[in-house]
Structure formats: structure tokens, C-alpha cells
Regions:
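Cys-dependent protein tyrosine phosphatase-like superfamily
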Residues: 19-214, 226-307
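Sec-dependent N-terminal signal peptides
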Residues: 4-13
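Ser/Thr-glycine-rich phosphate-binding loops at phosphate-binding pockets of nucleotides
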Residues: 219, 223-224
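N-terminal signal peptide c-region/cleavage motif recognized by signal peptidases
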Residues: 13-19
Length: 307
């Protein structure tokens, strides 16, 4: 796969995992970004808002825009990190992925609290015990903002049972269906457990009544990124844009960066082992292997690709 690196220092600071990494010449705007204090960077990283300076930087890096040429793919939902719309990418036959149908983000509430305690069954070892429900990240105003701006109907939560301890409904509110589906990422995406969770997840995207759908784990990076990679590949998004969309997660947090590159390579390698000349065809092979038909793939594309 052709590799591309983001022209933001914090995004490529740990890019040593890429053997082909080349440090680019920085523009004046990028140098100004690097001069920001850590607190200022954090403010920019945390959920870049519509048409912010960061979004403009992405735009100048040939990021493909939605059909109107104006809308950034970053979305602002107060309190929620790393939120963006799949809409605006270019897919099969040059068709644009529809906006407002699939959102990816960090979780709408914190993980449940946990602590390590002595494991009575295994002397000398510790085990993690989960307790209490994770604190909500949304205010009432933020929930109202979501209803007015996104209208999410389905909250697809990819976190573990422990992370979602004591949860029974979506933090977005009673009008949203919470679907808890513990899922895998990267190389584990191709394990039997990974395939079973992906089968549950993909079925949701075949029913138009479920849309708009929000997909998240805790950070919106690994588990979310792996599922979104499959969905985008099925829609015919180019290899370059698949990689760039994964890299964009590094924008929102200084702790999510290219250190995960070897794991991402396992995801790419897993698809490369499947039948198909292109990533799109390999994604089709994966979906067929977990029990879906060509008609299902066509249905998903009809929902997600603009005419």
C-alpha cells in the first residue's frame, strides 16, 4: 500500500514504525501549529470543530470534500472526541459517500471504573474488577445539539462487557437504540471471534431504518477504525484515503498516533490475504466469508453512495 504521512509534527513524531517515512518540509502554517503550547494543541486535538484551522490543514493535503465542497468531515458534538462523518469520501465509480449516515467517534460516556484485586483462584495474580457505570460525557444541551444536528438513531458500541458495566441504554437518550457489540481490531478482526462480531455489526448497516448510525469504542481508534476500514473499503474508497482516514485519529489526541502502525499493518495484511485484486474486492471476500451475499453488499452501497 502506498503510504502517506500527515504534515503535522505530533502525528509523525513517532512515525519510526514506517520504514518508508520521509520528513516533509513544513509550511509556515504548520510551523505555527507546532509553536502551540501543549494545552493549545490539546484544545485543537480534542474534537476538531467544523472548518477549524486543523480541518483547513487537512483540506490543503488533498483531502476529498463532500459534494458541496464546503463541509468538513469533522463533526462537533460537545464533550465527544474524534467525531467525524464518513460522508464526502470518493468511492466506487467516483460516487461520493453520503453525509449524515454514519458517524465515528469516541465513546459517549467514560468506561466503567475498575480496579485490580487479588485473584483468589490464581494466588499471586491480579484480576480486573469492573464496578459502576462510566460517567456520561454529554450534557443535556449536548444531547439536544445531537438531536438537532445529527439525529442519530443507532448507537453501535464496540466496547467490552466490562467497559460497559451497568449500561442498559445509550447515553445519547431514549430516542436512540443502544447496540452493544464487543468487537475486535487489527489482526484479531480476522479471528473467529472477530468475524462473529463483524457479522453482528454489518447486519445493522443493511437496514436503512437504523440510520444515522454512530460507531464508537472508547477512543474511536482501534476497534472503530477496523470496522470503518471495512465499510469504507466496501464503498470503494482508495487505499490512500483509507490510510489517511485512519491517520486522522492522531489529530484528536497526543496519545493516539503512529505507534499503532504495526497493528494497522496487520489489518491491511489480513485483507491482502483474501481473494481479490483490490482492497475493495478483498473486503467483499471478507463480508462473503461471514455469511453475507452480493445482494447485501449492493444494498449497503445503495444506502451509502450518492447516485
Amino acid at each position: 500500500m502506498k503510504r502517506r504521512v500527515l504534515l503535522v509534527a505530533l502525528a509523525f513524531a513517532s512515525a519510526g514504525a514506517f520504514a518508508t517515512h520521509v520528513v516533509p518540509v513544513l509550511t509556515a502554517e504548520q510551523k505555527a501549529f507546532l509553536a502551540l503550547s501543549a494545552a493549545e494543541r490539546r484544545a485543537v486535538f480534542t474534537n476538531a470543530a467544523y472548518r477549524t484551522k486543523l480541518a483547513d490543514s487537512v483540506r490543503k493535503m488533498n483531502w476529498r470534500e463532500p459534494a458541496d465542497g464546503e463541509t468538513s468531515r469533522w463533526r462537533r458534538l460537545p464533550g465527544i472526541p474524534n467525531m467525524r462523518d464518513l460522508g464526502g469520501l470518493k468511492g466506487l465509480d467516483g460516487r461520493t459517500v453520503a453525509c449524515g449516515r454514519i458517524f465515528r467517534s469516541g465513546a459517549f460516556n467514560d468506561n466503567a471504573k475498575s480496579e485490580l484485586v487479588d485473584d483468589a483462584d490464581h494466588p499471586g495474580e491480579k484480576k480486573r474488577v469492573w464496578k459502576e457505570r462510566g460517567k456520561d460525557r454529554l450534557t443535556d444541551d449536548a444531547r439536544k445539539f445531537q438531536i438537532e444536528n445529527f439525529g442519530i438513531r443507532t448507537d453501535l458500541d464496540l466496547r467490552t462487557d466490562g467497559e460497559c458495566n451497568e449500561m442498559t441504554a445509550s447515553p445519547l437518550g431514549p430516542q436512540v437504540t443502544w447496540v452493544h457489540s464487543p468487537s475486535q481490531s487489527y489482526g484479531s478482526f480476522f479471528s473467529n471471534v472477530g468475524k462473529a462480531s463483524t457479522k453482528r455489526n454489518f447486519a445493522l448497516f443493511l437496514d436503512e431504518r437504523n440510520y444515522p448510525i454512530a460507531v464508537h469504542c472508547i477512543a474511536g481508534a482501534d476497534r472503530t477504525g477496523s470496522l470503518i476500514y471495512l465499510l469504507e473499503a466496501l464503498l470503494g474508497v482508495s487505499d490512500d484515503d483509507l490510510l489517511l482516514d485512519w491517520e486522522l485519529t492522531a489529530f484528536y489526541s497526543s496519545t493516539v498516533n503512529f505507534a499503532h502502525a504495526p497493528r494497522y499493518d496487520k489489518l491491511v495484511a489480513g485483507f491482502a490475504r483474501l481473494p481479490g485484486r483490490t482492497t475493495c474486492e478483498q473486503a467483499e471476500s471478507y463480508v462473503r466469508s461471514i455469511g453475507f451475499t452480493d445482494e447485501d453488499i449492493v444494498r449497503f452501497r445503495k444506502i451509502m453512495l450518492c447516485p
